[in-house]
Every structure is written in structure tokens, then in C-alpha cells.
Amino acid sequence: MATKTIESSSRSGPRRTGVGSLLKPLNSEYGKVAPGWGTTPLMGVAMALFAIFLSIILEIYNSSVLLDGISIN
């Protein structure tokens, strides 16, 4: 066979580490969703501002609307 299964009876369970003990409280909230809209409006505002920022950068790159009145030597 191409695959080989090795069963080890020496492992009794997951190993405890210092980092794991520190991060366990953060993982205890996994899967829980706060009721209501939460921070969705804030994310919407951030996305709108980012879209405006990208459009300004694109206009500068294309030398279109923002740079019409500026002469470049």
C-alpha cells in the first residue's frame, strides 16, 4: 500500500503550552454572534471612504478630473 497508518498509544491528549493557555480565552467566544447589526454601519462607512480614496487615486493616475487646471512643464 502507498499509505501507512501508525497508531501511537503514547499520546494521551493535546499538549498544553503557555501560548495556548494565553489564547484560550479568545477562542472561547468562537461561533457566538452578537445580536443586531453590530459594527456593520461602521464597516459600510469604511468601505465608502475606501471607494472614494480609490477613485481619487485613479483620477490622479489617469490625469483626468483633478489635474485639468494644472500645467506640467
Swiss-Prot record:
What protein name does the entry list?
A: Photosystem II reaction center protein H
Its localization reads: Plastid, Chloroplast thylakoid membrane
Instruction: Give the UniProt keywords, A-Z.
Output: Chloroplast, Membrane, Phosphoprotein, Photosynthesis, Photosystem II, Plastid, Thylakoid, Transmembrane, Transmembrane helix
Q: What processes does the entry annotate via GO biological process terms?
A: photosynthesis; protein stabilization
Check the record and name the NCBIfam families matching this protein: PRK02624.1 (NF002728)
What family is it from?
Belongs to the PsbH family.
Q: Which gene name does the record give?
A: psbH
What is this protein's function?
One of the components of the core complex of photosystem II (PSII), required for its stability and/or assembly. PSII is a light-driven water:plastoquinone oxidoreductase that uses light energy to abstract electrons from H(2)O, generating O(2) and a proton gradient subsequently used for ATP formation. It consists of a core antenna complex that captures photons, and an electron transfer chain that converts photonic excitation into a charge separation.
Q: How does it assemble?
A: PSII is composed of 1 copy each of membrane proteins PsbA, PsbB, PsbC, PsbD, PsbE, PsbF, PsbH, PsbI, PsbJ, PsbK, PsbL, PsbM, PsbT, PsbX, PsbY, PsbZ, Psb30/Ycf12, at least 3 peripheral proteins of the oxygen-evolving complex and a large number of cofactors. It forms dimeric complexes.
Q: Where is the signal peptide?
A: none
Originating organism:
Phalaenopsis aphrodite subsp. formosana
